[in-house]
UniProtKB/Swiss-Prot annotation:
Name of this protein: Heme A synthase
Keywords, comma-separated and alphabetical: Cell membrane, Heme biosynthesis, Iron, Membrane, Metal-binding, Oxidoreductase, Transmembrane, Transmembrane helix
EC numbers, comma separated: 1.17.99.9
Gene name tied to this protein: ctaA
UniProt organism field: Ehrlichia ruminantium (strain Gardel)
Membrane topology field: Multi-pass membrane protein
Role summary: Catalyzes the conversion of heme O to heme A by two successive hydroxylations of the methyl group at C8. The first hydroxylation forms heme I, the second hydroxylation results in an unstable dihydroxymethyl group, which spontaneously dehydrates, resulting in the formyl group of heme A.
HAMAP family: HemeA_synth_type2
Gene Ontology molecular-function annotations: metal ion binding; oxidoreductase activity, acting on NAD(P)H, heme protein as acceptor
Reactions catalysed according to its record: Fe(II)-heme o + 2 A + H2O = Fe(II)-heme a + 2 AH2
Binding positions (heme): 262, 317
Transmembrane segments annotated in the record for this chain: 14-34, 96-116, 129-149, 162-182, 199-219, 260-280, 287-307, 311-331
Enzyme class at the top of the EC tree: oxidoreductase
Location (main, coarse): membrane
GO biological process assignments: heme A biosynthetic process
Length: 347
């Protein structure tokens, strides 16, 4: 994750484009959370990248779509009493999510082709943006692969595929955000000496793991479990955390264990961030920003858990995780600039 040596000078148009793409990903993540929490994701049973742009418009078309939905496990086991009006609401949420995905893809692709044609991008950037375009395509396929897992024999999607879908979004967001930072943040004014960047890589790694764990929590509906804290309550203990055999399967299949790990990692990130600020004395704006976002995210997470995963709170919790990740990348970028400035001053 060397984001300093690859600095690029690009025109203002490219900077604005990258910023818009990053915002587009964040909106997608937020809408994706709403789609999952309203149980809308399985309402569209086919994947038509081109024809799927057009929603049903007549009553006959809507009935045809509902008949397809009636063949799904979700309808058979959970929503068998759903009315056509209720089905339309679910369908349109999933439709909007897919449509927004197409729009974000085009918002990236069309300006990319334009800037490449106008020779506004270096060869290195062109190669990296081709990778991003490929990942966006893969993300579309992954989204359908995830949905398909809930159309066969279970009324819910695979939590593994859900996690992969979210991680692909994170990878795309990281690449876009990294290049935006490289194009915007070149110089800094403070002169703090930072000799070691290991702690910042640790923070980024833990946030990435935490986002993955959060996806598993969502996929396993772990947020709806008992609010008793393991080891601090007589109701939840070691046997509940490790009841699946072999024991390591609990890490990604046991909702109680996954939720517990999610909480532990959150506290660990907070402790490391506070130590970095107070003990290592990395008192710079990006560090304060990270800590503020971390406190906001912890508050959102606690409220989401206490109030049994309300849709808006849980969706905000999901998108704030990406913003927190972005702030950690910004922090690392800033620290590396500090190191370069320190070396230049010595010379």
């Amino acid at each position: 994750m060397n984001i300093i040596n690859n600095s690029e000078n690009v025109c203002t148009g490219v900077k604005i484009w990258l910023c818009i793409c990053c915002i587009g990903i964040l909106i997608m993540v937020f809408i994706g959370g709403i789609t999952r929490l309203t149980h809308s994701g399985l309402s569209i049973t086919e994947w038509n990248p081109v024809i799927g742009i057009f929603p049903p418009v007549t009553e006959k078309m809507w009935i045809a779509e509902k008949i397809k939905y009636m063949a799904t496990p979700e309808y058979k086991y959970i929503t068998s009493n759903i009315t056509l009006t209720e089905f339309k609401k679910l369908y349109l949420i999933e439709y909007f999510h897919r449509l927004l995905g197409r729009i974000v893809g085009l918002v990236f692709l069309i300006p990319f082709l334009y800037f490449m044609y106008k020779q506004k991008l270096s060869k290195n950037l062109i190669h990296r943006f081709i990778l991003i375009a490929f990942l966006i395509l893969v993300q579309g396929v992954m989204g359908w692969y995830m949905v398909k897992s809930g159309l066969i024999d279970r009324p819910h999607v695979s939590h593994y595929r859900l996690a992969m879908h979210l991680l692909l979004a994170l990878a795309i967001f990281y690449l876009l955000w990294k290049h935006f930072l490289l194009s915007v943040v070149h110089q800094i004014k403070c002169n703090i000496k930072v000799t070691n960047t290991s702690v910042f890589y640790i923070i980024i790694s833990l946030i990435t793991i935490q986002i993955t764990c959060g996806a598993l929590v969502a996929g396993l509906n772990a947020g709806l479990l008992s609010k008793d804290i393991p080891f601090l309550s007589d109701k939840v203990g070691l046997n509940d955390l490790l009841f699946i055999k072999p024991w390591w399967h609990n890490i990604y299949n046991n909702p109680i264990t996954v939720q517990f790990i999610h909480e532990v990692i959150a506290l660990l990130i907070l402790i490391i961030a506070v130590i970095t600020l107070l003990v290592l004395k990395v008192r710079i704006f990006p560090m304060y920003l990270l800590l503020a976002l971390l406190l906001i995210q912890l508050t959102l997470g606690i409220l989401t858990f206490i109030y049994n995963v309300p849709i808006i709170l849980a969706s905000l919790h999901q998108v704030t995780a990406f913003i927190l990740f972005a702030s950690s990348i910004y922090l690392l970028h800033y620290v590396k600039l500090l190191q370069i400035k320190y070396v230049e001053n010595k010379i």
